[in-house]
Amino acid sequence: MVLMLPIATDNGARLAAILPTGIAAVARGLGVDPIEVLERAIGIKQGAMGAAVGIDSDSLPVLRSFVVVVVDGLGHANLQARSAHARSISRMPTRRIETVIPSTTGAALTTLTTGRLPGEHGLIGYRIRHPELGLVSTLKDWHEISDRRAWQRSTPLFELAAAIGAKPVAIGRPAHATGGLTEAILTGAEYHGAVTIADRCAIASRLLRAGDPVVAYLYVDELDKAAHSEGWQSDLWLRRLEQLDAALDDLLRTLPGNVGVVVTADHGMIDVPEHRRIELDVDSEKFSDVAEVGGEPRMRSLYLRAGSDPVDVSRRVGEGLGKLAWVGTRSEAIARGWFGPMAPGVAERLGEVIVTARGQLSFTLPSDSPDARAMVGQHGGLSSEERGVPLALGGALEGSGFAAMVGRLAAISPATDTAPLTD
């Protein structure tokens, strides 16, 4: 039996709406037309926002500064399960939203900083096909990509933040201050590096208390690293969560009164035990038309040999894997709204057949490194645990209607089918 690909009723549009909504709230606080800012942020023509239900200036909070704290790998379900160890975050009003498809870092961080879904910005998976270089990782393989801002197609929103009079900043590890992905998704932001989570939050606190209006992106990847190495249910992951919570508590206690904070994530995590890491038999008959395999263990992308029929390959692979995976063609995934609107040339970055793991399992390859095979915590797929992320509100955003505005902004996209959030 071949399982039909599910329809994406939420393809990450709310995640995409967070930074546009925050910048618009700062614009309102600075006396700049926030509706025009929203139109520019999401790429619709001037005046078009007026017809959208519930989208008006009075629906936005009035902010001096805005901070989005992006915690790599902190899923909504992960946070709920360990809420006793994250008391500061758990006190924040929180809604569950969904990340992009695939639920992977390169795709989701780019959506967060550009306000565009993967089909538009182009970083549509972990290992995807470059027209000249072949399969490349969207996190690591940037050194041979000459035009990085063309490979990532969408403009980061930090330039818009500067245009309204705010200071755009990005705060993360010193090691992330330069590099291909940083250049592609953080262009326009002034980078501040700090080794520890506490020091990153301290930098944010100092900048916010300096007086100038700020739009800040603060990135924490320690939980993701801990989950990959030992699992999100490990003691190491729990220690990282406690460190994050303590640092955020200090940040929230030192906030000026007109600063809004969002805590969210790029994806959640599931733990995959060793016996559920299934090696794909790429030399078998059912894979005979497959030239290369990309993606990642929870969502594999099959690139076919010239002349192969994607429908036939999808059927054969799907019959072989049965209930272990959703298997469908690239065209089917696009038609079911997985990636949002598709810009020219982006579909070809994916393989013609998509294999998505179901349950707590993953699909490894014979060529995978020992480190890749040993990964416990994983993501990339469609499960509720992977795709559900928090939208937690702090500071001036508590009780402000910010979450509802995020939902309304997401819902006006013709490529999405989402119900507005309510506070």
Predicted segment positions?
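Feature captures the catalytic ectodomains and active-site-proximal regions of enzymes
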Residues: 1-423
